[in-house]
From Swiss-Prot:
The gene is albA1. Binds double-stranded DNA tightly but without sequence specificity. Involved in DNA compaction. This is DNA/RNA-binding protein Alba 1. The keyword Acetylation applies. It comes from Sulfurisphaera tokodaii (strain DSM 16993 / JCM 10545 / NBRC 100140 / 7). The modification N6-acetyllysine is found at residue 17.
Amino acid sequence: MSSTATPTPSNVVLVGKKPVMNYVLAALTLLNQGVSEIIIKARGRAISKAVDTVEIVRNRFLPDKIEVKEIRIGSQVVTSQDGRQSRVSTIEIAIRKKA
């Protein structure tokens, strides 16, 4: 399996196996640095953590200051080490500061 590492844009938070609060802190840090819009991305089992991250930022830390701009869902074909292909669900949630 060959992996090509593509650089992640500076306004993207990739959600994975860490605790949800790590991703909340990353999102809050980006917003406090002056980034007006950030994208929370996840796939597979981490999708629920991505949704939790957005909801915690929106409701607990920055109520009435953040809005969900766009939600994109899809799937990716992933090839395992033994050559089998499977589909993995993906989500991208774009949030931004209210004007």
